[in-house]
Amino acid sequence: MSYHNPYTPPRKSATFDDYTLAEIRRAAATGIYDIRGAGTKRKVPHFDDLLFLGASISRYPLEGYREKCDTSVVLGTRFAKKPIHLKIPITIAGMSFGALSGPAKEALGRGATASGTSTTTGDGGMTDEERGHSQTLVYQYLPSRYGMNPKDLRRADAIEVVVGQGAKPGGGGMLLGQKISDRVANMRNLPKGIDQRSACRHPDWTGPDDLEIKILELREITDWEKPIYVKVGGARPYYDTALAVKAGADVVVLDGMQGGTAATQDVFIENVGMPTLACIRPAVQALQDLGMHRKVQLVVSGGIRSGADVAKALALGADAVAIGTAALVAIGDNDPHWEEEYQKLGTTAGAYDDWHEGKDPAGITTQDPELMKRLDPVAAGRRLANYLKVMTLEAQTIARACGKNHLHNLEPEDLCALTMEAAAMAQVPLAGTSWYPGKGTF
């Protein structure tokens, strides 16, 4: 019989922690890989690892209540006849009808419109409610082509060609059968109740030269009026940004691994892609090397939560940001009000990510008619507008403290890093020094 010293409790493995052991047992019992929504849950270097250097003697701050700080941004100035003018540099990322309920899509449109910004469709096409309540709507053109309608291309204010997504760069999408309702099936030309797997690459091109041809096609369809965005997942941001610019993009959307998804394999979300913080500087460098920084706009997404995150992304060189998961939380996702029902689903408010199952108590990531009734799109849209207002005010507060009268005047020299990793990724000095690792390399 083995003896354990009472003063030395059994020690668990850091490699085989409780979660890892449970996952091994689950996989052994079911033979099925884990599917979930949202973005990575592992801790990665992020905007929290950066701080702003406020003005003191060497800089002149602005008065918060007397001196203005502009927040406007124009997207699509390169080729489009009708670029998009936004009041704030915070947009709503692409999330599909199907993954989200109709009321949720309407709420996103209402909130974005009230805030003077844009929202985006997603895999599966455009709904009339979304178009009707979105003053500025970006139409996603995806590899699956589900729900693609040339008439909707013309009804949109911009087109976003999706090449990749931060939560799963190199992977396609999925919408499980329980969310393929009659309406979703009709829009996507699919059988009701059958799992949908979306392609991971576009069927009519094999490389960047073909992307250029596709962009020209879309310009012809829309009479060169609409800005053309190209969205890529954060994997090789320097080269992907450069190739998107070469192909003729007006705007590059760069999505880091903290960006959410409706459903994919957990192993994909946690092990493929790069943190948002690591993606921005290489993309900006590519634009600068091509003489296109601020001429081709850069929109950054993936884990944007606050006005501080917005300000940091802009300081690193982005023109705007996009939010997805945060917007869903603002309209009611994972609300503790539904805690009892989350527990019945085997989870808790704040951790619910089984969006693919279509059982969301909040009525957001579901197609269940009874659950959808729980979400009031008018009230939810108002909450989103409030959240966007606060984010904007927070970003303005920081910009004024740094002596800037426009959010786009924020720059890397306004930042310092708390960790070596963040300093290397953001290419800003480690706090208390003028040094950062990896200068001149990506």
Curated annotation (Swiss-Prot):
Keyword Oxidoreductase: yes
Keywords assigned by UniProt, alphabetized: Oxidoreductase
Superkingdom to which the source organism belongs: Bacteria
Keyword Oxidoreductase in record: yes
Single Gene Ontology MF annotation: glutamate synthase activity
Gene Ontology terms describing biological process: glutamate biosynthetic process
Disordered as annotated region, ranges: 108-133
Composition-biased stretches (Low complexity): 109-121
Family of the protein in this entry: Belongs to the glutamate synthase family.
PANTHER family xref list: ARCHAEAL-TYPE GLUTAMATE SYNTHASE [NADPH]
Protein name stated in the entry: Glutamate synthase large subunit-like protein
Source organism per UniProt: Rhizobium meliloti (strain 1021) (Ensifer meliloti)
Lineage: Bacteria, Pseudomonadati, Pseudomonadota, Alphaproteobacteria, Hyphomicrobiales
Recorded name of the encoding gene: glxD
